[in-house]
């Protein structure tokens, strides 16, 4: 359901300065003011005062400062906001080694401590700001408490760095692979750790399967 909240043109303009070209901004915080989504803060890398390579710590120092800014502007997460953050991190790919990645994350921050009315307004207005930003350019996260906005939580859920998503992808694709290779009749061993692949464990699984 639409809330009737409009999006200020400066929202898209500022976002372009974060997502395109020289990437002037590192993060932007948006708020709803008088039925309009506006830019509350647009922070540059220089303003963060971080001189090291963001890829070395997967943006942790920058992200920690971003979280503190959000907490300050929401009175310790008792108010709602939207935000975008340019997340730089490294990930390991099989056969490709370590790669540097850049993802823009969009946070819909509706903390448990905010009023029900505020949460409803921000939830119903989220589609409007995401459309303005362009959903194809952002990874979307919903935040209801500080733990869901932790650096570790978001890093683990970024594509190419998400162990849970990789396991889900492999699990959902195994049937198609077996059908393509004509392996439907073969016995299948699932391994969640290296001990599941030792000879004794595999033999035990084979014997158990024969008894069924």
From Swiss-Prot:
Depolymerizes growing actin filaments in muscle cells; required for the assembly of actin filaments into the functional contractile myofilament lattice of muscle. Competes with unc-87 for actin binding and inhibits the actin-bundling activity of unc-87. Disulfide bonds: none annotated. One of its GO terms (biological process) is muscle thin filament assembly. Interacts with F-actin. Gene3D superfamilies: Severin. InterPro entries: ADF-H, ADF-H/Gelsolin-like_dom_sf, ADF/Cofilin. It holds the Pfam family Cofilin_ADF. This is Actin-depolymerizing factor 1, isoforms a/b. GO terms for molecular function: actin filament binding. The lineage of its organism: Eukaryota, Metazoa, Ecdysozoa, Nematoda, Chromadorea. SUPFAM superfamilies: Actin depolymerizing proteins. GO terms for cellular component: actin cytoskeleton; cytoplasm; ribonucleoprotein complex; striated muscle thin filament. SMART domains: ADF. Residues 3-159 form the ADF-H domain. Belongs to the actin-binding proteins ADF family. Keywords: Actin-binding.
């Amino acid at each position: 359901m639409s809330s009737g909240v409009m999006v200020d043109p400066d929202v898209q303009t500022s976002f372009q300065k974060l997502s395109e070209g020289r990437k002037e901004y590192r993060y932007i915080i948006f708020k709803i003011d008088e039925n309009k989504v506006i830019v509350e803060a647009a922070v540059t890398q220089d303003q963060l005062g971080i001189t090291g390579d963001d890829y070395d710590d997967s943006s942790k120092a920058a992200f920690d400062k971003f979280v503190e800014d959000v907490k300050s502007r929401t009175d310790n997460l008792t108010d709602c906001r939207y935000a975008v953050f340019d997340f730089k991190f490294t990930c390991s790919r099989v056969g490709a080694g370590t790669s540097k990645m850049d993802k823009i994350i969009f946070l819909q921050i509706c903390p448990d401590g905010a009023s029900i009315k505020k949460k409803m307004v921000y939830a119903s207005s989220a589609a409007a700001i995401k459309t303005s930003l362009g959903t194809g350019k952002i990874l979307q996260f919903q935040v209801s408490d500080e733990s869901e906005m932790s650096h570790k939580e978001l890093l683990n859920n970024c594509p190419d760095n998400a162990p849970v998503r990789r396991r889900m992808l492999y699990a959902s694709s195994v049937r198609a692979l077996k059908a393509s290779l004509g392996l439907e009749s073969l016995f299948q061993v699932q391994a969640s750790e290296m001990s599941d692949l030792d000879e004794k464990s595999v033999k035990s699984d084979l014997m158990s399967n024969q008894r069924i």
